[in-house]
């Protein structure tokens, strides 16, 4: 009878296991196909043994902590298998503490792109001076902060640091002296819809000269005057505006972009903030919650 039970269950189990993502193969082959009363059956294993099994199936992930993994699987060792184990694994990983409680966001862009107005939209109040002017309005670094989704957002508005007239090395040192530790977790490169000009291209180039090519892994393209797109989507605008340079920049930033109507209120304002936070969470996840750092010439490695 035991032979028949084992044979039938083994055939069914093997078929199911073949459809699972790789981290679960060894776990289920070793434990869930065991007969009742045999060693290795998880329903008869102790909590300690369950913890050991969890480490073996997830130890390949560099962002998982052994203690956290063990704790999460001990809560319900007899829980039913999810319909999509891979999805639950991703959820468990993302629930790890990769998001700092305090996030520093750096606003950059050419003069007139709407940096200050975007900063005010993120903060939910008027903090930075914002007006239409042919000359730069923001003449110095300014900071504002707010609580959002249980996190403290520190938004830093910048003067015209991406001007081609500036010396990249001198600008980088000045930024390091002014910005507080731990440094920016995301850089918001502000671009006005419908006006991706040569100056915008120069601003993107200067951004990389100042911070290094690695900065694009922390950069989100923020398009202001989103309302001018009317019924069209931002994705369509980027891909169909016949501007290969803009599309290439978006690709370099891994398609992280969002649109802002800086006159929006209520639900529209909340929706665009939510989209921005999703892009920020994406950066934090990909970089394991670390802020951006760079090497300065003739200076030891310094955190921006």
Swiss-Prot record:
Record domain AIG1-type G: where: 100-301
Principal localisation: cytoplasm
UniProt region (G3), positions on chain: 157-160
Signal sequence bounds: none
G2, as annotated region: 136-140
Region (G5): 261-263
Region (Disordered): 39-86
Subcellular location, record wording: Cytoplasm, Cytosol
One of the GO BP terms on file: lipid metabolic process
Family membership: Belongs to the TRAFAC class TrmE-Era-EngA-EngB-Septin-like GTPase superfamily. AIG1/Toc34/Toc159-like paraseptin GTPase family. IAN subfamily.
Protein name: GTPase IMAP family member 6
Organism of origin: Rattus norvegicus (Rat)
């Amino acid at each position: 009878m035991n032979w028949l039970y084992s044979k039938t269950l083994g055939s069914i189990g093997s078929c199911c296991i073949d459809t699972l993502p790789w981290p679960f193969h060894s776990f289920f082959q070793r434990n869930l196909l065991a007969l009742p009363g045999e060693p290795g059956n998880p329903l008869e294993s102790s909590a300690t043994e369950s913890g050991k099994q969890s480490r073996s199936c997830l130890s390949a992930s560099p962002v998982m902590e052994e203690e956290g993994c063990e704790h999460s699987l001990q809560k319900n060792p007899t829980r039913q298998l999810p319909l999509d184990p891979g999805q639950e694994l991703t959820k468990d990983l993302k629930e790890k503490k990769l998001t700092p409680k305090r996030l520093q966001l750096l606003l950059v862009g050419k003069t007139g792109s709407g940096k200050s107005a975007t900063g005010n939209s993120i903060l939910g109040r008027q903090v930075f001076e914002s007006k239409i002017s042919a000359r730069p309005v923001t003449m110095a670094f300014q900071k504002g902060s707010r609580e959002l989704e249980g996190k403290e957002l520190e938004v830093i508005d910048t003067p015209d640091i991406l001007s081609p007239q500036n010396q990249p090395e001198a600008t980088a040192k000045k930024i390091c002296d002014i910005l507080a530790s731990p440094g920016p977790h995301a850089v918001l490169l502000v671009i006005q819809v419908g006006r991706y000009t040569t100056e915008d291209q120069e601003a993107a180039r200067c951004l990389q000269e100042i911070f290094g090519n690695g900065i694009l892994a922390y950069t989100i393209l923020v398009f202001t005057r989103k309302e001018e797109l009317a019924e069209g989507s931002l994705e369509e605008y980027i891909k169909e505006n016949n501007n290969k340079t803009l599309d290439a920049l978006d690709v370099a930033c891994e398609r992280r972009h969002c649109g802002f109507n800086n006159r929006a209120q209520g639900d529209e304002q909340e929706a665009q903030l939510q989209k921005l936070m999703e892009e920020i969470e994406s950066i934090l996840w990909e970089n394991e919650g670390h802020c951006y750092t760079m090497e300065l010439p003739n200076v030891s490695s310094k955190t921006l």
